[in-house]
Amino acid sequence: MAARRTRSNARPISKTKRALAAPAEDRPGWTFLSNHAHVLLLIAKEPEIRLRDVATQVGITERAVQRIIADLETGNYIERERVGRRNRYKVHRELPLRHPIEAHRKISSLISLVVDA
């Protein structure tokens, strides 16, 4: 494989500058909600959703979804029930959000804002 030729006085373009130079639809985006919130919201909307579908909709790997599910279970935000070969999840909507800034709100507030709207 041939090395990429550059002018000796040319500086490499950083990933950030390359991303900003891309058209808006190609730029990597950011969101106000975390991947944990996205996974929780999808489960609240569809309790029998497959991890593959969660991964596709959130834009992360299935392995990342598994880790998030484990975090949510450890925090008692969700319960997993085995139904045949599938899982059914129950969201504990009465629990508070985790960060001190939003801890005065319950999970149900977030779900009603995004899913139930």
Segment roles from a protein language model:
Residues T56, E73-T74:
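Alpha-helical residues within the helix-turn-helix
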